[in-house]
């Protein structure tokens, strides 16, 4: 669910699952947006990860109160953005999947009060 060059876009109570990788392929992407807010959303098994903040025009974006289960490839991707706020989310992460994506993670991000739980397998079995 990706807005592009939007001002104050709001995404609430959505589900994104099983997206496939094509350079990115995450559930959510504040792509060059100003003030995008994602809250109370659910994502699972997206090959590109959970959320991306894309390019230097991606400013003042917030990702809060969301649940990510078994997203892959790196959960967060701050890609060239000057700021992003990620707070009070629940991330259920498979062993070996990094919190920050290995590629496209050269932006800035502030993390606050997020819950990260390691899971054993794709079915969500806890370790």
Q: Which functions belong to the PLM regions below?
A:
Residues 2, 7-20, 26-27, 34-49, ...:
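Right-handed parallel beta-helix
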Residues 25-29, 51-54, 75-77:
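Solvent-exposed loop and edge beta-strand segments that line ligand/cofactor-binding
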Residues 58-59, 101:
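Hydrophobic alpha-helical segments
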């Amino acid at each position: 669910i990706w807005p592009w060059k939007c001002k104050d876009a709001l995404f609430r109570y959505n589900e994104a699952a099983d997206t496939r990788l094509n350079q990115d392929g995450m559930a959510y992407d504040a792509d060059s947006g100003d003030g995008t807010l994602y809250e109370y959303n659910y994502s699972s098994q997206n090959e590109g990860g959970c959320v991306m903040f894309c390019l230097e025009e991606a400013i003042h974006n917030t990702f809060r109160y969301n649940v990510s289960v078994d997203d892959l490839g790196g959960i967060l991707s701050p890609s060239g953005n000057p700021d992003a706020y990620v707070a009070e989310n629940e991330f259920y992460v498979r062993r070996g999947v990094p919190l920050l994506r290995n590629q496209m993670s050269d932006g800035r991000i502030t993390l606050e009060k997020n819950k990260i739980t390691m899971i054993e397998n794709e079915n969500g079995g806890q370790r």
